[in-house]
């Protein structure tokens, strides 16, 4: 999705940020993150506008939108993440204030795992290896019917994940600030 030079520049930018440990109901995760545009707080289940998406992410937002067949302006949330060796993400579905997800993996490969509950109580499983500089899109059934996780890696990895707002997210956004579309000029 992006070239080597762009990846190096993005990693340098990400390493210069003060990313915070991921918080989930009072627990601290092994990965470090920062949200722009919108932020979902897992400690109190709040959803609010936060700092605007930085200008230096505009070209990668454009690439993510082109990859996902989306308008760049619809990608109103971005989550930057650093995964030190041993860090992964447990099984989950993204919160319902978000809809489509376009992620980009940087530095090292990641295994994106999927599972869907079956009628007999078990799981149907699949996985995809996401190479550095490549992307993935979660929409439709993959987004809403399957859970996903990222296996812990043994090397430093970064990710940039863009999201659109769902109908619910847009309703909440309109109630709180009157607009949902963010354009950086």
Residue positions per predicted region:
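Non-heme Fe(II) oxygenase metal-center motifs and adjacent flexible, charged/small-residue loops
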Residues: 1-185
